[in-house]
UniProtKB/Swiss-Prot annotation:
PANTHER family: RIBOSOMAL PROTEIN S15, BACTERIAL AND ORGANELLAR, SMALL RIBOSOMAL SUBUNIT PROTEIN US15M. One of the primary rRNA binding proteins, it binds directly to 16S rRNA where it helps nucleate assembly of the platform of the 30S subunit by binding and bridging several RNA helices of the 16S rRNA. It comes from the Bacteria. The gene is rpsO. This is Small ribosomal subunit protein uS15. One of its GO terms (biological process) is translation. CDD domains: Ribosomal_S15p_S13e. It holds the Pfam family Ribosomal_S15. Gene3D superfamilies: 6.10.250.3130, S15/NS1, RNA-binding. Belongs to the universal ribosomal protein uS15 family. Signal peptide: none annotated. SUPFAM superfamilies: S15/NS1 RNA-binding domain. Keywords: Ribonucleoprotein, Ribosomal protein, RNA-binding, rRNA-binding. GO terms for molecular function: rRNA binding; structural constituent of ribosome.
């Protein structure tokens, strides 16, 4: 199941840097993190769902690249985001 519009708007409201912000790195990483967590739960139940596993790996790679970009350009924002999302970095 894809992320609902209400849930996505809730995540955007929490991580947006300013009014109307939907594309900042923080928002993108937060949405990807929610999707990754959701797919992890699905994979635990359906171990042979290889198509979903591939999609999960693509999302993890996308999040990794966005976090590397943020770390390179603004370490303080990177650390705040990692702490607020509870990621292991």
């Amino acid at each position: 199941m894809a992320i609902s519009k209400e849930k996505k708007n809730e995540i955007i409201a929490q991580y947006a840097r300013h009014e109307g912000d939907t594309g900042s790195v923080e928002v993108q990483v937060a949405v990807l993190t929610w999707e990754i967590n959701h797919l992890n739960d699905h994979i635990k139940q359906h171990k042979k769902d290889h198509a979903t596993y591939r999609g999960l790996m693509k999302k993890i790679g996308r999040r990794r690249n966005l976090l590397a970009y943020l770390r390179k350009n603004d370490v303080n924002r990177y650390r705040e985001l990692i702490n607020s999302l509870g990621l292991r970095r």
